[in-house]
């Protein structure tokens, strides 16, 4: 009887040891970077007041007419870009503010007076340039790049007076450059526009263009390095016309 008890205890210890070893192996597997983590080019950083998405090393395009589906695994960030002119039931490129380039095709949108400029991405370049530079727009289109028009928030390190009234408090977002890097930057909380600009300048932003915001227009999403998608602001209408797509 005593011998049988000893054998039983030995068997129990062996099973426990094997089980413990299996758990260690499972843990190691969980810590192995996923395919998304290995190829995740966007970097996300936060400050006290800002969320900064570094998209310097990412591929960019401008989606028009239909917002990319949140299930598209290769999309790591999708946010509204240029202003939409009118709330229409059907899509028209002429309802997007200013010249814009989507999938390498140049379209002319509606015109609006003010301090507007263009952000473009092509051939691994990301650049801001003044509205009216037709040669540059055609260069971007020939290279199958992307571009959209928006108003200056910061130009050459100085705050810019926006052409639209921005006295109310809300979430604000811009596309920006500093120290050779390109970012999409959003306020963490509802703030005044002047405070948002102040935060950007304190972070050393040199140039920045506004991105369409406001209730419903700010609906967007991003995907973290594990592949999980997160909705940024709820969807309240179907009138948005164009989105910056980051892959």
Protein language model features and the residues they cover:
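Sec-dependent N-terminal signal peptides
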Residues: 4-13
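Catalytic metal-binding/acid-base residues of hydrolase active sites
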Residues: 83-84, 214-216
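Short glycine-rich loop/turn motifs
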Residues: 114-116, 169-174, 240-241
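Conserved beta-alpha junction segments in alpha/beta enzyme cores
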Residues: 149-179
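Zymogen propeptides
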Residues: 20-111, 185
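Active-site-adjacent helix-turn-beta-strand microarchitecture at beta-sheet edges
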Residues: 88-161
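Conserved, well-ordered active-site substructure
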Residues: 91-110, 166, 177, 181-190, ...
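C-terminal motif of bacterial Sec signal peptides marking the signal peptidase cleavage site
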Residues: 15-17
């Amino acid at each position: 009887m005593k011998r049988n008890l000893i054998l039983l205890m030995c068997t129990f210890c062996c099973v426990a040891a094997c089980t413990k070893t299996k758990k260690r192996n499972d843990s190691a597997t969980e810590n192995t970077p996923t395919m998304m983590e290995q190829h995740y080019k966007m970097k996300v950083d936060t400050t006290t007041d800002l969320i900064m998405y570094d998209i310097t090393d990412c591929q960019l395009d401008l989606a028009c007419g239909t917002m990319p589906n949140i299930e598209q695994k290769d999309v790591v960030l999708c946010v509204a870009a240029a202003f939409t002119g009118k709330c229409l039931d059907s899509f028209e490129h002429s309802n997007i503010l200013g010249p814009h380039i989507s999938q390498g095709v140049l379209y002319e949108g509606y015109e609006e007076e003010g301090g507007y400029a263009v952000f473009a991405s092509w051939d691994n370049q990301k650049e801001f340039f003044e509205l009216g530079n037709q040669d540059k727009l055609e260069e971007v289109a020939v290279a199958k790049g992307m571009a959209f028009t928006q108003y200056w928030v910061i130009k050459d390190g100085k705050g810019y007076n926006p052409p639209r009234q921005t006295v109310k408090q809300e979430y604000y977002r811009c596309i920006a450059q500093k120290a050779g890097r390109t970012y999409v930057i959003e306020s963490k909380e509802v703030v005044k526009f002047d405070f948002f600009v102040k935060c950007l300048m304190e972070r050393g932003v040199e140039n920045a263009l506004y991105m369409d915001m406001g209730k419903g227009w700010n609906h967007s999403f991003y995907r973290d390095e594990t592949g999980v998608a997160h909705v940024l602001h709820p969807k309240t209408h179907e009138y948005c016309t164009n989105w910056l797509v980051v892959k």
